[in-house]
A protein has these predicted regions:
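Catalytic-core loop-and-flanking beta/alpha module that positions acidic residues
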Residues: 1-159
């Protein structure tokens, strides 16, 4: 099984701290409207009870076992609901389906990049490298800024 995680927002101070090396990293905005396998892109379900799959589930595999495992990949504790997460979940069967040519081409995701957002603390060298990399593309580059009036982030376009 392969899982890729995405969020509906790029303005969460907490997520920049957790997932972008304390605001030194970056966030990528994708446009998945033309994604071939978007039926596998689902919102995460935030719940207070754990979604249960027995530890010895391999002993109980049935034709529907794949669905149970797939479904389990879409659950997360309600504590994380601020993430507004979506997951692209592909099973081994999906990955070998002829429609996907043996496996999902990871590099093809580049075609869906709309923008790159640099963290508040991203270095100037990192900014230069990102701007150089996307110079001849339609990808927009932004730097996140902390609001002076409240606890929020705003994106300022730099390229």
């Amino acid at each position: 099984m392969r899982v890729a995680c995405f969020s509906e927002t790029n303005r969460s101070i907490l997520m920049w701290s957790h997932y972008a090396h304390n605001h030194q990293g970056f966030c990528i905005e994708y446009d998945f409207s033309q994604l071939e396998y978007k039926q596998h892109l689902k919102p995460v379900r935030y719940v207070s009870e754990r979604h249960y799959i027995p530890g010895d589930f391999a002993d109980h595999i049935s034709p529907n076992a794949g669905n149970a495992i797939y479904e389990a990949a879409l659950y997360k504790s309600a504590e994380w609901s601020y993430e507004k997460e979506w997951r692209l979940v592909m099973s081994k069967i999906d990955l070998t389906h002829p429609e996907y040519s043996e496996r999902i081409p990871v590099m093809a995701v580049n075609a869906f990049i709309r923008a790159v957002y640099l963290g508040v603390k991203a270095s100037k060298d990192f900014e230069k490298a990102i701007c150089t990399h996307y110079k001849e593309t339609p990808v927009k580059i932004y730097r996140m800024k902390l609001s002076a009036s409240n606890y929020s982030l705003q994106a300022e376009q730099i390229q």
